[in-house]
């Protein structure tokens, strides 16, 4: 096994008067799909000792399509879809809940490097990224993950970031405000070059034997290549439903009416009110993800297995992206169903674009995104290069715009994340008052829904999806709790019944994925053996 730089070059790069991240990589001689690799490296289909914190990030890129049976295709020469990433062995995990933060180091060499700040949740995440020099990072023409912090930011972080200022306390929640792993070894799939690489970004400290560390990386690359060689086709499990709980329809429609009253009184222009469906039973998260990817391929596909919590998602919407000094936000607002034929599909899209309510709401949220980006951008650099495009997904069509700016010299990716969080399309306008009303009207804390899943890269880049079209799976010991959530933007002329139907449409993709695997044995060994009865 050889890495892309020699031992001597690695040692030379590691010479510095401060800790250094030396980037190196090994191309693996394997023929394996990302989900199959994830299953093997997390101990699902191998004897690997699995870490409790793992991730799979994939994408199916946006394409213009009027085909109601397939709005997306794996066009791999665009921004999102070229790469897939598997993280399997992090150095540490950072968990932030309210005013409390915790770092668990899995490698003693990182125990005093990964810290928290004691400020707000974004300050804690910035502090958790070790202060290092970077060596041997290649120039890339596109954004990609080279190691760093990977995880999720719950919507409920708004209490720490914004709502403390107006006297609202964080409610008790089953979820942390943020949970991120520090990853220094990432399996990268390049779907254009058709290669699989193991990318290393270890922190090498002063006085450390860099040559010995290089030898560890070579051994790890050999181990991973062996694990990923000659794997059998992946067999995933299914879903057994025991119970389902959904909030009463009239309760949601009453909340919509109350939100409309706030709009009419001038408190807000728009507010996003969401509702949940909770399903109980047993589910295989890998089977769930596999089905969701088939049913609803999207720009952001993610499977985060973080201890007893799994987040499975197919999000269409960028919260914020920073590549170099280029900041991007992609507000999506405006929804209609897919048609049963190309003609009906186009008709529905045309009606959506002609709807004055949809256009006004979308324009307002684009203005909100411009204001968010402007907070971290150089003066005069904010642009809207794409306005009111129609994007087609498996169950719905959306109106999307793109807002860009040039990152100011005194700002970084963490500042950009704070400035744009939460997305206006998941809160409302003006944001603070809309979030106060959400706190009043929604039945329970949102958790990851409406927050973000993504990463802060070593080199200062970031890419976050808004957590929508997603589900959380909580392992409660004797059963799993699966939570699906969706919201609708409420304005002065909103119809409560129509807004309820919109939330149902937005949940359809995730619920259809569960239905696709329902009845299949949850236990993979049983399924492979052909047993009909499910045991856990």
Curated annotation (Swiss-Prot):
The keyword Magnesium applies. It holds the Pfam family Chorismate_bind. Mg(2+) binds at residues 361, 502. GO terms for molecular function: anthranilate synthase activity; metal ion binding. Its EC number is 4.1.3.27. Pathway: Amino-acid biosynthesis; L-tryptophan biosynthesis; L-tryptophan from chorismate: step 1/5. It catalyses: chorismate + L-glutamine = anthranilate + pyruvate + L-glutamate + H(+). Binds 1 Mg(2+) ion per subunit. Transmembrane segments: none annotated. L-tryptophan binds at residues 59, 299-301. Tetramer of two components I and two components II. PANTHER family: AMINOBENZOATE/ANTHRANILATE SYNTHASE, ANTHRANILATE SYNTHASE COMPONENT 1. Belongs to the anthranilate synthase component I family. This is Anthranilate synthase component 1 2. It comes from Haloarcula marismortui (strain ATCC 43049 / DSM 3752 / JCM 8966 / VKM B-1809) (Halobacterium marismortui).
């Amino acid at each position: 096994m050889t890495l892309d730089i020699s031992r001597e070059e690695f040692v030379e790069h590691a010479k510095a008067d401060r800790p250094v991240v030396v980037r190196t990589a090994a191309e693996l001689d394997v023929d394996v799909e990302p989900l199959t690799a994830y299953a093997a490296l997390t101990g699902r289909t191998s004897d690997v000792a699995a870490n409790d914190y793992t991730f799979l990030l994939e994408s199916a890129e946006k394409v213009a399509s009027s085909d109601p049976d397939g709005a997306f295709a794996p066009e791999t020469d665009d921004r999102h879809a070229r790469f897939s990433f598997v993280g399997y062995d992090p150095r540490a995990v950072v968990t932030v809940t309210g005013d409390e933060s915790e770092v668990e180091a899995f490698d003693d060499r990182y125990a005093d490097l990964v810290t928290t700040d004691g400020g707000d949740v974004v300050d804690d995440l910035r502090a958790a990224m070790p202060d290092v020099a970077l060596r041997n990072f290649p120039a890339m023409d596109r954004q990609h993950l080279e190691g760093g912090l990977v995880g999720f930011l719950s919507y409920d972080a708004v209490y720490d970031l914004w709502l403390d200022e107006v006297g609202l306390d964080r409610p008790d929640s089953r979820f942390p405000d943020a949970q991120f792993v520090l990853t220094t070894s990432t399996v990268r799939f390049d779907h254009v070059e058709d290669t699989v690489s193991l990318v290393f970004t270890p922190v090498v400290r002063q006085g450390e034997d860099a040559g010995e560390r290089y030898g560890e990386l070579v051994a790890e690359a050999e181990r991973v290549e062996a694990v990923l060689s000659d794997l059998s086709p992946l067999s995933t499990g299914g879903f057994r439903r025991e119970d389902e709980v959904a909030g009463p329809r009239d309760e949601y429609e009453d909340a919509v009416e109350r939100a409309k009253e706030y709009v009419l009184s001038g408190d807000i222009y728009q507010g996003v009110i969401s509702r949940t469906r909770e399903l109980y039973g047993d589910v295989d998260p890998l089977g769930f993800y596999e089905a969701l990817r088939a049913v609803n391929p999207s720009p952001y596909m993610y499977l985060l297995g973080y201890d007893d919590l799994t987040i499975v998602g197919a999000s269409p919407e960028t919260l914020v992206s920073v590549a170099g000094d280029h900041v991007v936000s992609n507000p999506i607002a405006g929804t209609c169903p897919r048609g049963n034929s190309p003609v009906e599909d186009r008709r529905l899209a045309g009606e959506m674009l002609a709807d004055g309510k949809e256009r006004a709401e979308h324009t307002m949220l684009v203005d909100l995104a411009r204001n968010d980006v402007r907070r971290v951008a150089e003066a005069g650099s904010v642009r809207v290069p794409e306005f009111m495009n129609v994007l087609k997904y498996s169950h719905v069509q959306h109106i999307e715009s793109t807002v860009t700016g040039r990152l100011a010299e005194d700002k970084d990716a963490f500042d950009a994340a704070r400035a744009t969080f939460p997305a206006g399309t998941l809160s409302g306008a003006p944001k603070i008052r809309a979030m106060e009303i959400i706190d009043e009207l929604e039945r329970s804390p949102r958790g990851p829904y409406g927050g973000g899943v993504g990463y802060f890269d070593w080199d200062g880049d970031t890419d976050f999806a808004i957590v929508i079209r997603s589900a959380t799976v909580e392992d409660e010991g004797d059963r799993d709790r699966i939570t699906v959530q969706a919201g609708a933007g409420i304005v002065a002329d909103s119809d409560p019944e129509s807004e309820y139907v919109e939330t149902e449409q937005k949940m359809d993709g995730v619920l259809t994925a569960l239905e696709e695997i329902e009845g299949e044995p949850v236990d993979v060994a049983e399924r492979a053996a052909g047993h009909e009865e499910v045991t856990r």
